[in-house]
Design a protein with these regions (language model features):
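Active-site-proximal substrate-binding core of FAD-dependent oxidoreductases
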Residues: 18, 194, 265-271
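Structured binding elements
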Residues: 177
Length: 271
């Protein structure tokens, strides 16, 4: 803000506006129009081009490439509010501040993945666990902790719907963690399982794909998100991508955003 930036929250964008083939601004859901010749989107590419820009405003070949982006997700996330620090077997309290992976071997990973091919939930998921309150005590009250885990693999829409499977799958995840942290279940104050469908609904990620596009060989490096849009600038003058759907992808490294900013500066674009 000291640099003249106006930061606005709760200002959801409804559409990207064009003047000819150039960006002219955005329209917010409340009907307000913000005029600008430069839009840098952190939304996933499908949301950006399909929902906000509109495929009808793109060249046919480019629109086809957008429609072919694969956003299938097999990732859920669980959050556990705990009344104490869980005790993982043979791990020190200091080690609990690191990333904990439950994936004993390749066969385990394959067995965890196989059910999703049939829209079923696995019985022994791969888990990527973090207890963020170990490193940041301000997240909770003294003595309390928060455990979060990425859960691989969970179908977007299991047979029968998530309303039939959500609690059972939550129990599967908790039981699996408890095998490594005995007594965990007695420490749980509250739990939340975010399915791929929840991630899509709550965070606007197409398909619940938290990488904004599958990390497959034909969707990474110079192919991300697709040929003709791999250098952050799109075919629409003034529209750029800066999120996980752009090279080199997501995570907490921020490189896609840094690279997009460098590209905007190189092209001499100004809002």
């Amino acid at each position: 803000q000291n640099q003249g930036v106006d930061i606005r929250t709760a200002a959801k964008v409804a559409s990207i506006n064009l003047k000819g083939s150039c960006v002219a601004g955005v329209t917010l859901e409340n009907g307000e129009c913000v005029t600008t010749p430069l839009v840098i989107s952190n939304a996933d590419p499908v949301t950006t081009f399909t929902n906000l820009l509109g495929l009808q405003n793109m060249e046919t070949g480019m629109a086809r490439r957008v429609s072919q982006i694969r956003n299938n997700s097999g990732t859920a996330k669980i959050h556990l509010a705990l009344n104490g620090l869980p005790q993982f077997t043979r791990l020190t309290d200091e080690q609990l501040g690191h990333r904990l992976i439950i994936a004993p071997d390749m066969n385990y990973i394959e067995r965890a993945f196989n059910p999703i091919k049939y829209q079923e939930c696995c019985s022994a998921p791969v888990l990527d666990i973090s207890i963020s309150s170990v490193n940041d005590p301000t997240l909770t009250s003294p003595g309390k902790h928060v455990l979060s885990a990425l859960v691989q693999y969970a179908p977007y829409s299991p047979i029968g719907g998530w309303h039939q499977h959500k609690q059972a799958f939550t129990d599967v995840v908790i039981d699996r963690i408890s095998q490594y942290a005995p007594g965990l279940r007695t420490q749980i104050v509250a739990s939340e399982l975010c399915t791929p469908a929840d991630l899509e609904q709550n965070y606007g990620m197409t398909g619940g794909q938290w990488h904004h596009g599958e990390l497959a060989m034909d969707q990474v490096l110079m192919m991300r998100p697709f040929p003709g849009c791999s250098q952050y600038a799109s075919a629409v003058d003034g529209l750029y991508l800066c999120g996980a759907g752009a090279h080199p992808g997501g995570g907490v490294m921020g490189l896609a955003g840094s690279n997009a900013a460098a590209e905007v500066i190189k092209r001499g674009k100004k809002a």
